[in-house]
């Protein structure tokens, strides 16, 4: 059993060592192999009892190691204790680590079930299918946590996956699984002392499986020419401490400092100024129905008027008031007076002196922070627990469809992507299908300090440039703010933890990629294959039981 524990630990460490931002993704091609060998050998050993429990425990160990190390930075989020002092939030770290490890272990357990009942071939087809189905689930349910979607593993080595414009990140996930399964076949054949000719064929096949997609990608990368007209943008990075400054400092003072940062760096050709997530109005919120009367909004309209073709795009905190519950939305909460209801939004605004204000509400929300998942079901069960550990029992308002920012003075159609939304591939294509020819990402990654958190989010988000062939302008509160071209290259950036501004020029592409048009085709096929094989396996088991009863 010690050997299998070592195998599980090895799998966890290989997956970790292959993951961004410091890992080398070649290791992802063998990361699952030790765990697959463990499952295979335990299944074959007659002396082992409770094989399913052993495999579940070992897979949990592997996935726990992977999750725990990769998102170690999460515990640097701060929460307030009973005395009002800030300290590291271990609950914000342990809950996703344990939950995601558990979900992954259940997926692997289902693979073991199918492989045992339906045979090796069905099992090895089922494994990538159910894993990608789980990855798709993590993108769409309220417990959404797609940080470990396998295709993200190539985010730093994006030159390897330029074909994401056809497949999205699920192409990367399928690639990883095909190589892992081939290497698994090779090792089992070697252990079973198969002919050298057979082993050589498998080895060559595994090598080609890795080399050919990388070669194709580099050809695409070298030959891709950016498309579209030029757009000149100024990015702001105010670098406000989210715990001791951003929500404690006077909102007008925060805005004035942001304004001065913009005015000092605007150039004659600047067409857009982009500020980060919730940059205005500071520590309070704009009232949705009275936005045009807000002093900050009016001032922005005044200084953007000084230049004909100037637009200010920023993240904003917005509140919508409902005088009675009958008018409130499903996500609304009641104020302390017990009468007035309101929705809070994490939003983006486009403001200029010549156009009406464009508004977009963030709609992929962070579980436990911006949304209480499945509130009607879980609130009575764990509501108090969430409050005690610094979470929320409320949910921010959202909008049902993606919308884009247009203007009257240039051809830019902006996809306003807010923070967490930037890691959702199929979701981002909705903006582009609405006409977006450039992506503006507004984010505040300061909650975890100078850790891998903000670097991983930057790298994941840059994959959207490849999938849609859209340039990205990224404004982050403390960094990393950047300009990313249509190939996924970071052209310019501001380091983390520095206040500053960055001028850059991007191109506005209006052509649609295959992935933009059709989305996660591979994931949909995986769902179908998973469903068919699982149904077949259950039917086989049922028939076996019925035949056994007859005997």
Predicted feature locations:
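CN hydrolase (nitrilase-like) catalytic-core segments centered on the catalytic cysteine
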Residues: 100, 128-129, 272, 278-280, ...
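Conserved hydrophobic/aromatic beta-strand scaffold that supports enzyme active sites
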Residues: 16-19, 109, 235, 348-350, ...
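A generic fold-level signal
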Residues: 21, 158, 228, 307, ...
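Soluble catalytic regions of membrane-associated enzymes that act on cell-envelope
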Residues: 218-371, 404-411, 416, 420
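Short, conserved active-site loops that position catalytic residues or coordinate cofactors/metal ions
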Residues: 21-36, 66-77, 237-238, 269-287, ...
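Amphipathic beta-strand/beta-sheet edge segments enriched in Tyr/Trp
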Residues: 338-362, 480-496, 500-506
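Membrane-embedded alpha-helical bundles of multi-pass enzymes
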Residues: 1-221, 450, 461-464, 476, ...
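Active-site catalytic loop in hydrolytic enzyme cores
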Residues: 73-95, 118, 137-169, 333-420, ...
